[in-house]
């Protein structure tokens, strides 16, 4: 396993001794870690909902024959794969020799621009292959030993309460979620549950006017009772919503998108386009979460042997083109210097294809980390297909990187958490 930096630092990273070497010293800063300005930094989480098929996303070229043996009908033909060794010749002939699905040309370009890290076999110790349980485990930051280890708070919410305590409550939302009508458990703090605004189904420009039209006179006093406490919570939440709505509306109207960013007409592109406009408009929101659904590809993942068009083909195209346009947008000026994106999927897929040109629920999957602060490279090695047998239902179970390691690296080294 090659020791390749994930983020370039000129001094020792805060996560040293906590994380594997591939996740230590991970961001490319020009100044020493102690002098970094963290104030404007933001992360953008892209949820690939449904369980992305990592083996058809990041193709393991060093064990390609084993891959084809497990997937005779749905494998990506080698002639179509985008080999990363064409960019980094050090990968060729090693157990890190990988290629990208042909519809990930945007991600391939980011790798070429030194802005994409690929992390292999991301997961957690006690894998749960329920969509609902696994995404809750990811959002709460736990190991999967039970549904959520007794936690009812999320890692984002706890991070915000601990690291940005002086900003709570504030005049802008600490988090903005788009793409899912259910607000993510990840944004729930131990004490605060109103840290994020969910814009799903909303027009950001008119968000404030919609909310403000619902407001009236708040009561000045509350009964000293359970009812009074609940009423005060509702009033406080409504007041915060109006404040947040004003901040979102102002930022959206003040912001703009780079005219040269070629956003496609897709749902994910619209979500990321909104994020870029809000950031350029000056809002100080720290964490954005967007969503691309449809990755539960039990059938018609491909059309058939040799024809990789199908559900997964279209999803990866939507992901890649949206991310490439977003990066073109934010990198057109200095705001891109302070943005890191990360893909998250609740689990991967089985090594073996099923009988419906698809794949069933698996465990580990690769993650993409991208942005100007990121150093291109590969962390981890290609999977060992010999562990996928009938006795374990053809699962790849070996976790190379606990998802919490990736999150901890970003929070500590990029956002400056302690």
Where are these regions (language model features)?
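Metal-dependent active-site segment of extracytoplasmic phospho-/sulfohydrolases and closely related
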Residues: 323, 330-355
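Histidine/acidic-residue-rich catalytic or RNA/ligand-binding cores of hydrolases
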Residues: 354-358, 362
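Active-site lining segments that contact anionic ligands and/or coordinate catalytic metals
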Residues: 285-287, 336-338, 344, 362-365
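Feature for exported/extracytoplasmic and membrane-associated proteins, marking the mature portion
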Residues: 2-321, 325-332, 352, 366-418
């Amino acid at each position: 396993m090659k020791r390749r930096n994930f983020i370039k630092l000129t001094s020792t990273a805060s996560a040293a001794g906590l994380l594997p070497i591939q996740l230590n010293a991970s961001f490319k800063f020009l100044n020493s870690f102690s002098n970094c300005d963290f104030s404007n930094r933001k992360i953008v989480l892209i949820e690939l909902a449904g369980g992305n098929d990592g083996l058809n996303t990041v193709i393991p070229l060093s064990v390609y024959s084993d891959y084809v043996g497990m997937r005779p009908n749905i494998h990506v033909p080698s002639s179509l794969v985008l080999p990363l060794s064409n960019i980094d010749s050090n990968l060729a002939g090693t157990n890190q020799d990988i290629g990208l699905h042909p519809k990930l040309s945007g991600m391939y370009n980011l790798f070429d621009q030194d802005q994409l890290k690929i992390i292999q076999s991301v997961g957690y110790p006690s894998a749960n292959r329920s969509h609902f349980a696994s995404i809750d485990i990811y959002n709460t930051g736990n190991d999967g030993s039970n549904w959520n280890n007794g936690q009812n708070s999320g890692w984002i919410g706890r991070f915000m309460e601990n690291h940005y305590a002086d900003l709570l409550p504030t005049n802008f939302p600490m988090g903005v979620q788009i793409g899912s009508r259910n607000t993510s458990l990840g944004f729930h703090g131990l004490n605060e549950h109103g840290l994020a605004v969910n814009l799903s189904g909303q027009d950001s420009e008119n968000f404030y006017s919609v909310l403000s039209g619902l407001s009236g006179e708040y009561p000045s006093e509350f009964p000293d009772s359970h009812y009074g406490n609940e009423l005060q919570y509702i009033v406080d939440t409504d007041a915060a919503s109006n404040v947040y709505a004003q901040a979102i509306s102002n930022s959206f109207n003040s912001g703009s998108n780079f005219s040269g960013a070629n956003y496609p007409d897709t749902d994910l592109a619209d979500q990321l386009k909104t994020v870029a406009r809000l950031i350029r408009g000056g809002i100080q929101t720290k964490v954005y979460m967007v969503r691309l659904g449809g990755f539960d590809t039990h059938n018609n993942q491909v059309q058939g042997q040799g024809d990789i068009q199908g559900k997964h083909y279209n999803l990866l195209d939507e992901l890649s083109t949206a991310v490439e346009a977003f990066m073109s947008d934010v990198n057109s000026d200095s705001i891109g210097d302070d943005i890191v994106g990360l893909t998250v999927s609740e689990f991967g897929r089985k090594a073996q294809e099923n009988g419906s040109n698809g794949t069933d629920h698996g465990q580990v999957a690769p993650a993409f980390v991208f942005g100007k602060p990121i150093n291109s490279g590969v962390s981890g090695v290609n999977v060992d297909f010999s562990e996928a047998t009938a006795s374990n239902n053809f699962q790849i179970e070996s976790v190379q990187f606990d998802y919490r390691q990736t999150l901890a690296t970003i929070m500590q080294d990029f956002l400056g958490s302690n």
